[in-house]
């Protein structure tokens, strides 16, 4: 088992990475929580594979377990689903001394975590991420949110979990497209902070070799995120580097109404697009875009998307959470493994955000 300690003072917690940890989850929770009620929030896809098993495992340790199952997919991460969750929590008579457990991918973790952060002004919660993207990114660091019609993650909070339990065996039932979806974020970590990870990703022969080394990959990504979050928990400076590729990526997701491409696919395109622009401007080392293109192709992610309209992308990007007044903070690469934040005036963003 690999364990990382997120050091955030009173908000510190452990990140556990171990194959088979889901089989021991009730015992693990009992070491962290001595109350009676646990609300398990999951989605209909994950529930089919793991809901009943984990519910029984937790009940075996004497807890009263209540389950909330939401529809899978980004379209569920909205205010209506959130209010439905609030209503169920009220029906269950949940108090601030009870516990929420989120079991699922990024959508479940985000909306379940936001419900925990806001219901009764805060209930403790534990993350059990089941997708690669959630295991290496969204379950760690305390960002919780829901989407609005105008854009992604526009209503949110910073609310740290009591613990994160990561079981790579969940990935065995993950559709190959969603494994590659997670690789969009994995590539991001290598590109911004870890050239050695990027090199290993280039060297893996196929998905089988990737899965043989998945604990290394997960740990490498979580280690980077832990370090960045510890330095900047509230996303005022360094933590913005974790949004490399996301300004364009989120805009593309919104452009297609979250229907055509996954989050990781859009991030991959966003990384390639902004780097092609910054290399053209002489900011990024020559050849970096080609390296990104090759690794994006290797993991079946898009570097070219048809039918995008620049004006709409600029319009959506203006709502990006990295915007500050008339400026937007963009994450750019100097080279693989070396990034920086560039403060760009809104009227100049087209140079960087132009779709390619």
Curated annotation (Swiss-Prot):
It comes from the Bacteria. NAD(+) binds at residues 106-110, 130-131, 143, 152, 170-173. Its main location: cytoplasm. CDD domains: DHQS (cd08195). Gene3D superfamilies: 3.40.50.1970, Dehydroquinate synthase-like - alpha domain. GO terms for cellular component: cytoplasm. It is found in: Cytoplasm. Pathway: Metabolic intermediate biosynthesis; chorismate biosynthesis; chorismate from D-erythrose 4-phosphate and phosphoenolpyruvate: step 2/7. Its cofactor is NAD(+); Co(2+); Zn(2+). GO terms for biological process: amino acid biosynthetic process; aromatic amino acid family biosynthetic process; chorismate biosynthetic process. It catalyses: 7-phospho-2-dehydro-3-deoxy-D-arabino-heptonate = 3-dehydroquinate + phosphate. One of its GO terms (molecular function) is 3-dehydroquinate synthase activity. Pfam families: DHQ_synthase, DHQS_C. Belongs to the sugar phosphate cyclases superfamily. Dehydroquinate synthase family. Catalyzes the conversion of 3-deoxy-D-arabino-heptulosonate 7-phosphate (DAHP) to dehydroquinate (DHQ). This is 3-dehydroquinate synthase. The gene is aroB.
């Amino acid at each position: 088992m690999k364990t990382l300690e997120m050091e955030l003072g009173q908000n510190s917690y452990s990140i556990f990475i171990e194959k088979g940890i889901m089989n021991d989850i009730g015992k693990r929770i009992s070491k962290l929580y001595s109350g009676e009620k646990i609300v398990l929030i999951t989605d209909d896809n994950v529930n089919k594979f793991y809901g009943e098993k984990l519910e029984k495992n937790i009940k075996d340790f004497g807890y009263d377990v209540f389950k909330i199952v939401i529809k899978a997919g980004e379209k569920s991460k909205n205010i209506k689903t959130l209010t439905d969750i609030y209503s169920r929590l009220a029906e269950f008579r949940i108090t601030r001394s009870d516990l929420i457990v989120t079991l699922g991918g990024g959508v479940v973790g985000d909306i379940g975590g936001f419900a925990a952060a806001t219901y009764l002004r805060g209930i403790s919660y534990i993350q059990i991420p089941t997708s690669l993207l959630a295991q290496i990114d969204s379950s760690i660091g305390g960002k919780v949110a829901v989407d609005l019609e105008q854009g992604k993650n526009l209503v949110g909070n910073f609310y740290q979990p009591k613990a994160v339990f990561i079981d790579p065996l969940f990935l065995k039932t993950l559709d190959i497209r969603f494994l590659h979806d997670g690789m969009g974020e994995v590539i991001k970590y290598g590109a911004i902070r870890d050239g050695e990870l990027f090199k290993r990703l280039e060297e893996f022969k196929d998905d089988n070799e990737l899965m043989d080394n998945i604990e290394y990959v997960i740990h490498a990504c979580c280690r980077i995120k832990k370090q960045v979050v510890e330095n900047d928990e509230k996303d005022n400076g360094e933590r913005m580097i974790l949004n490399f590729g996301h300004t364009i990526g989120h805009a593309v997701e919104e452009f297609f109404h979250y229907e055509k491409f996954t989050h990781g696919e859009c991030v991959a395109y966003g990384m390639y697009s902004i780097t092609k622009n910054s290399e053209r401007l002489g900011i990024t080392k020559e050849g970096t875009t080609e390296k990104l293109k090759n690794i994006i192709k290797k993991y079946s992610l898009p570097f070219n998307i048809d039918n995008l309209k620049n004006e709409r992308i600029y319009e959506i990007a203006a709502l990006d959470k990295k915007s500050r007044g008339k400026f937007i903070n963009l994450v750019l690469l100097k080279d693989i493994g070396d990034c920086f934040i560039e403060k760009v005036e809104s009227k100049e963003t087209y140079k960087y955000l132009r779709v390619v």
